[in-house]
From Swiss-Prot:
Keywords: Repeat, TPR repeat
Signal peptide stretch: none
Keyword Repeat in record: yes
Bridged cysteine pairs (disulfide): none
Protein name according to UniProt: Tetratricopeptide repeat protein 32
Organism: Homo sapiens
Pfam family of the protein (one): TPR_8
Length: 151
């Protein structure tokens, strides 16, 4: 069991190295393998020590989501960010990443909720503060345009 845990950790470390080098296809394959391995461990009767840590699993989902975001597969990326949040609800980064996509797609109310959650979890997250302010401004502008269009 210890060997499986070390192998899983090595997979995650290698995935991160590929990610940092911009080798996204390799990183995505390794993150996916890690996520599958965690799902198998969680669904089997293995001892709790053999399962993946929530932090590592959430990081794998978040980083795989980033790769999908880079490919402009926004909905798939949001699925991974949501999975990261479900595994580790106090991990602010996937809320921020999902909020960015929601903002880009024009779902300002949902983006606002994610950015507010980031700041609840980490009040010093400057990019989230800026994104929240920009989302509010763009939502107000959209509302002004809609009102003007209806006259």
């Amino acid at each position: 069991m210890e060997g499986q845990r070390q192998e899983s950790h090595a997979t995650l470390t290698l995935a991160q190295a590929h990610f940092n080098n911009g080798e996204y296809a390799e990183a995505e394959a390794l993150y996916s393998a890690y996520i599958r391995r965690c799902a198998c461990a969680a669904s089997s009767d293995e001892s709790p020590g053999s399962k993946c840590s929530p932090e590592d699993l959430a990081t794998a989902y978040n980083n795989r989501g980033q790769i999908k975001y880079f490919r402009v597969d926004f909905y798939e990326a949001m699925d991974d960010y949501t999975s990261a949040i479900e595994v580790q609800p106090n991990f602010e980064v996937p809320y921020y990443n999902r909020g960015l996509i929601l903002y880009r797609l024009g779902y300002f109310d949902d983006a606002l909720e994610d950015f507010k959650k980031v700041l609840d979890l980490n009040p010093g997250f400057q990019d989230a503060t800026l994104s929240l302010k920009q989302t509010i401004l763009d939502k107000e502008e959209k509302q002004r345009r809609n009102v003007a269009k209806n006259y």
